[in-house]
Each structure stands twice: as structure tokens, then as C-alpha cells.
UniProtKB/Swiss-Prot annotation:
Keywords: Disulfide bond, Hydrolase, Secreted, Serine esterase, Signal. GO terms for cellular component: extracellular region. This is Probable cutinase 3. Its main location: secreted. It comes from Neosartorya fischeri (strain ATCC 1020 / DSM 3700 / CBS 544.65 / FGSC A1164 / JCM 1740 / NRRL 181 / WB 181) (Aspergillus fischerianus). Residues 1-17 form the signal peptide. It catalyses: cutin + H2O = cutin monomers.
Length: 217
């Protein structure tokens, strides 16, 4: 069986066994508070993992958004998922950037929108699985002024963890927190999916506290 087949089979099998307690959560959710809502003090941009539905997914994105609002105030945070050309398909995981350029561009568009629509907002970001590669590559592509407005980033099941040496190249390491669960082989530069890769919902509160500390500092 090829590595690609293992990746697809692993996702299919483990998705059925994922510990998501609610059917609604399994279906994923979307948040477009930057695109459709008023400017808020903090904007959280998130890219979901492969095959997750909605633009926030269900494994960890909605949890970080909810916890961040609890920490900072629901009227202070706008949550925005990366959608559009980023359709979270499986195949782009096998490309050199662990995603495709169209998906990276979809994320950079969200950073650009936050900057132009809400110039005073503090930007934080996160990504899970393929979404971690989307955010990683997007932040590298930002110009220096916009990159400086990104106050903190959290990455879960970081597919480029080995390649990028546990950081986002060109972005401050102390503003980045990477979550790689014990037994998550994706963090070891493989695309083999284990149960550990679906465990990051448990880290949502901690990730939100990290991001909150960066915008409050």
C-alpha cells in the first residue's frame, strides 16, 4: 500500500472513531466574522485540516475560537476561517509545501483583509494538519509590516515540523506555539495518520491562553 493510500485510509478510519461528541461538531463549522462583521480588537485567522468541513473544521479550530472569546470577551474577538480556494483536499499534502499555492493565497488574503479592513486589530492565527502548512507558508509570504502585526500563531499536528525545524521561518519563535501530540507521526515528516493526530481539541484552551497572552502583552 502506498503512503498516499495509508494517509487516505488512516483519515477515513480515524475520522469514524474521532472523539467528537456532537454530530454538529463532526460536520464542522464556519466563521466569517472578519469578512461579514465589524472590526474587533483581535482577529483570529484559522485554517482547518484536510477533509474537515466548514472553514473552521471541528477538531480544534472552533475550540480555540470559543476559548479565545472566553478569555478576551466575545465582543473583542473576530474569528475567521480560511475558505475560498482552500478546500482542504487530500492531494495537496503531497506537494513540496504540504499544500498548494491557491490555498496559501486564500490565507494571505485573510491577513490582507484584516490589515486593510481593520488596521487597528491585533492578528493571531492558527492551523491544524494541512492547515498548519497553509498558515506557515502564508505568514512567510507576508511583507514585513503585515507580518509584524501578527502577534501569535498556534500550529497543531504541524506537517512541516521537521522541514521548518519546529518554527515558522522568518517569524519570531517566541510568538509561535507548536502542538505535536505524542504518537502523531505527521509531526515526524510522514503522512501516516494515527489517533494522536485527532487529539488536538484537548489543547484548544491552552492555545487560546497563549494567543491571549500575546495580544495582552
Amino acid at each position: 500500500m502506498s503512503l498516499r493510500s495509508l494517509f487516505v485510509a488512516g483519515l477515513a478510519t480515524l475520522a469514524l472513531a474521532a472523539p467528537a461528541p456532537q454530530i454538529q461538531a463532526r460536520q464542522g463549522m464556519s466563521s466569517n466574522e472578519l469578512e461579514s462583521g465589524p472590526c474587533r480588537d483581535v482577529t483570529f485567522i484559522f485554517a482547518r485540516g484536510s477533509t474537515e468541513q466548514g472553514n473552521m473544521g471541528f477538531i480544534v479550530g472552533p475550540g480555540v475560537c470559543s476559548s479565545l472569546k472566553n478569555d478576551l470577551g466575545s465582543d473583542k474577538v473576530a474569528c475567521q476561517g480560511v475558505g475560498g480556494a482552500y478546500t482542504a483536499q487530500l492531494a495537496p499534502n503531497f506537494l513540496s509545501q504540504n499544500t498548494d499555492q491557491a490555498s496559501i493565497d486564500a490565507a494571505t488574503d485573510m491577513f490582507d483583509l484584516a490589515n486593510t479592513k481593520c488596521p487597528n486589530t491585533k492578528i493571531v492565527a492558527g492551523g491544524y494538519s494541512q492547515g498548519s502548512a497553509v498558515i506557515d507558508n502564508a505568514i512567510q509570504a507576508l511583507d514585513s509590516d503585515l507580518k509584524a502585526k501578527v502577534k501569535g500563531v498556534v500550529l497543531f499536528g504541524f506537517t512541516r515540523n521537521v522541514v521548518d525545524k519546529g518554527q515558522i521561518p522568518g517569524y519570531p519563535k517566541d510568538q509561535t506555539k507548536i502542538y505535536c501530540a505524542l504518537g502523531d507521526l505527521v509531526c515526524d515528516n510522514t503522512l501516516i495518520i494515527t489517533a494522536a493526530h485527532l487529539s488536538y481539541g484537548a489543547d484548544a484552551d491552552d492555545a487560546a491562553k497563549f494567543l491571549a497572552s500575546k495580544v495582552q502583552g
